[in-house]
A protein has these predicted regions:
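Long, low-complexity segments enriched in small/aliphatic residues
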Residues: 272-364
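Non-catalytic alpha/beta scaffold blocks inside enzyme catalytic domains
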Residues: 1-94, 101-284, 344, 348-459
């Protein structure tokens, strides 16, 4: 469309605010429609219909989630979505932009205050000045690297702030046996889960307060903060009585461990910080003054306070000072295009599921109910494979790394999926996701696109 109507592109925005368009344009024009249709699973007519909608929309927000990120080329997929927004100037103006969907109340907020495996993203010099110590500057571990470290014995201790790590990770079948060999496994949690049972002798389960429970410390009732998906930071006060008088807050547990494990430091006041969380927020404001000045005063303003986003003001934090177009090496987000008889596995969550926790067995979003031990497949694909709806089948990984991965006892269920794709529920299907399949940039596990075969299950 842009070939025939130059007004579809925001030429002024592209010239002033972007770089790399020429390279990306050359890559796009090197593609053929047959390749695009085969890779996407969509006909040209459908793609052009969607393109017309986008081209005529005055304001567009690109919303994405794990369907884009959890691929071998997931980061490049997000880059392609940003490319689409850049072409019509849909960044940095009202009613437009890009919005990742995040479920947990602080999955973004913890990054904002420097929790990262990448030392270059943490203000280490500031922390050294504040607290009179030399912080470690070694690169930490991603999820993939932690699991690999468990398998090869490099990881000796594990401390989890909530979550169900052992069920959320890929390659559970390989990882499950090694948990019992850890010298130390500390789980700080609000409810029991499977990870708490895969332990050895040096294991501690420390229950803590949930955010909705009253948190009384020596300084009185305490509040915490969360950051939402749109970068607004809100205060939160628990209103329910704690489940037990003996419960400690996460902050109290972490500070208690640190106080017992580390030598005294006159610049570090663990007990005071536990007694008054406002003092911790003051330290955050001192560490990030451009974001958190007046933190305690602003946290309860209606709607929360806006953290800010340079892109909103068309300020690009890149080496070129401009927004860069992404030119991928491959059209497909997959590691390899599946061969004959091989399907790409999509791990799914039901609408009554939050992360690894399943609250019910009615997946109303997909019109499914009951057993979660199912595999979804297009009716035409079922027929082509010589299978039948309702048949018991198994999924068998075809990833060639020397390990056997199989999930059986699944009911074959017809569903409107693209040809060559099958769907199964997360985390049950994580046993089929190889540890070696992950995004090449972020190392996010490839919970989408793992290669599998659907075979009859005689058992």
């Amino acid at each position: 469309m842009a070939q025939t109507d130059s007004t579809l592109l925001d030429a002024e925005f592209l010239a002033q605010h972007t770089s790399g368009l020429e390279e990306f344009d050359g890559w796009v024009h090197g593609l053929g429609w047959s390749e695009i249709e085969e890779t996407s699973g969509l006909p040209r007519s459908d793609l052009e219909s969607v393109a017309r909608i986008y081209a005529t929309a005055k304001r567009v927000i690109g919303v994405y989630g794990m369907g884009l990120t959890q691929h071998v080329h997931g980061a490049k997929s997000i880059g392609m979505l940003i490319n689409l927004l850049l072409m019509r100037g849909n960044l940095g103006r009202p009613g437009a932009g890009i919005c990742p969907v995040r479920g947990h109340s602080n999955v973004q907020g913890q990054r904002t205050v420097g929790i990262s495996e990448k030392p270059e993203l943490v203000p280490l010099d500031t922390l050294a000045r504040q607290f009179g110590f030399e912080p470690p500057r070694d690169t930490g571990m991603t999820t993939i690297e932690v699991v690999q470290g468990l398998l090869d014995g490099r990881v000796k201790a594990f401390l989890s702030l909530g979550g169900n790590f052992a069920r959320a990770i890929p390659d559970q079948g390989r990882a499950d046996p090694v948990w019992s060999g850890l010298a130390l496994n500390v789980q700080i949690a609000t409810r029991l889960n499977r990870s708490h049972t895969l332990v050895g002798d040096g294991a501690w389960l420390l229950p803590c307060l949930v955010r909705g429970e009253e948190d009384h410390q020596s300084g009185g009732p305490q509040a915490v903060t969360i950051e939402d998906s749109l970068s607004h930071i809100h205060g939160s006060i628990g209103r329910r009585p704690p489940a037990a008088d003996t419960l400690l807050s996460e902050l109290a547990i972490i500070a208690g461990i640190a106080k017992a494990a580390l030598p005294p430091n006159p610049a570090v006041h663990w007990d005071k910080w536990v007694g008054d969380y406002g003092l911790v927020r003051d330290l955050i404001a001192d560490t990030y003054p451009e974001l958190f000045t007046g933190f305690n005063d602003r946290m309860f303003q209606p709607g929360g306070f806006y953290k800010g986003n340079p892109v909103r003001d068309r300020v690009w934090k890149t080496t070129s000072g401009k927004a860069g177009f992404t030119t991928p090496a491959s059209l497909s987000a997959l590691d390899n295009v599946p061969g004959s008889g091989v399907c790409s596995l999509i791990t799914l969550r039901s609408n009554d599921q939050f992360n690894t926790t399943t609250y019910g067995f009615r997946d109303r979003l997909r019109g499914l109910e009951g057993n979660r031990n199912i595999v979804l497949m297009a009716p035409a694909g079922i027929a082509a494979a010589g299978l039948r709806a309702g048949q018991k089948v198994a999924l068998r990984s075809t990833h060639a790394d020397g390990y056997t991965r199989r999930l059986g006892g699944l009911t074959l269920t017809p569903y409107d999926l693209p040809d060559g794709c099958v769907g199964a529920y997360y985390p049950e299907a994580n046993v089929l996701v190889p540890l070696g399949l992950h995004d090449l940039d972020s190392k996010t596990p490839a919970y989408k696109g793992s290669p599998v075969r659907v075979v009859p299950d005689p058992n």
